Structure formats: C-alpha cells, structure tokens
Amino acid sequence: RADYEAGAMSAEELKKTEDKAITELVAKQKEAGYHVITDGEFRRATWHLDFMWAFDGVGHSKTETGLPFHGEAAMIDDTYVTGKISYKKNHSFVEHFKFVKTLEDENTVAKLTIPAPAQFLEQMIMPFAWSNTKKFYDTQEEVAKDIAEGYREFIKEVYAAGCRNLQLDDCSWGMVVDPAACKLFGVTPKGLEKIKEQLLEINNSALEGKPEDLIVNTHVCRGNFHSTYA
C-alpha cells in the first residue's frame, strides 16, 4: 500500500497483491478450523475510518497532530464532516466482502467487520471534531439520524451481496466508562449519561428493519495503534 500511495504501484497491481494475501489468509483460517472467514481488513488503511470515508459528507486529510493514545499519538488521517452525511451506493466494503464470499465453502461463512454506528457518531461529536461538525448540523441528534440512515442503506446493499454475518467494531463503550470520560468528551457527568444514551440509540436505530437471518455481533475494545489504546 505504501508503494501504491507513492505512485510506484498501480491500483490493479495493489488489488492483485491484496487478493493473493487475502486468499492465503483465508486458507490459514480454514486450516485452523475457523468456521467464519474474513479478509483481515487487508484492504484498509485503518480498521474504521475507510468505512466512513466512503460516505457522502465525510472528508479526510493527512494528520499533523494525530489522535492522543496512551503514550503515543495515533498518526491516522483526520476525518471530519464536509456536508450532510448520507450513504453513497456501491460502497467499497461491499466489493471487499464479495471477494471473501467467493472463498466460502460448506464449512465456512464470510463475515464483514465494520465500525459500529456509535463509533462513527463519536468520531464526529468529540470535542476535537464538534466545532467543525456544527457548521453543518445544529444538534448531535441530527448527525446520529443521518448516520443511522446510512447504515440501514449499507446493510441492505451488503445483505443483497450475500452477507449474513456482520460485526460492529466499537471502541466507544470503553471510552465512556473511562475515569476521565467527562474530560475526554468535554461534558459533565449528566452530559456523559446523555452521550451513552445517544450511542445506544444510534446502534439500535441503525439495525432497525434488518433481515432476520442476518447475524450481527459486536467487538468492544479500546482501539489499537502500535499496541497503545485510546
């Protein structure tokens, strides 16, 4: 990917390299006895932000300061609102999933991992982001409404592509129970309770109307960048 970003590799060459690496990875998963297979997120720059970048109304640029993790700044792209957030059809993650789907067999099911709606919302309402987000939204509830609608559209599209196992990766819960949570979010204890409710509500709203045979699970952690955490 570094070669691609430096202009030393074409998009076609990058995809061939990714396809080969993912095929080898899935073979190892099967050898280990896994019944659920994934692409290891090999096509992404980060585990979560690439998903957001594919939405209308979301932009990103090379960071100068990074995000403060414990002991180190995570030097990942700044990601921010550029307009009203909405789902853009033909999301790249749907294509990513389709490739893994071709590697299924009678013993395995392809799973797609994406950031949870709460994670998306948190990215846009934390103090470092809200001053920009409020140029386009009057309230955080309006942001949540648009994000949830976008997720519902994405779920329809990836389900139509054959996805029956979707994982929501969510670092937001570890942050809201941190002893320093009020400082992190720039709120009072009462304000923090409101944020917790918002995170719960957006996750539930995004899943409204999902197909009954779509399995949705979640993974909760504090993030990972060079083995440090948010």
Regions inferred by a protein language model and the residue ranges of each:
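Domain-level signal for soluble alpha/beta catalytic cores
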Residues: R1-A230
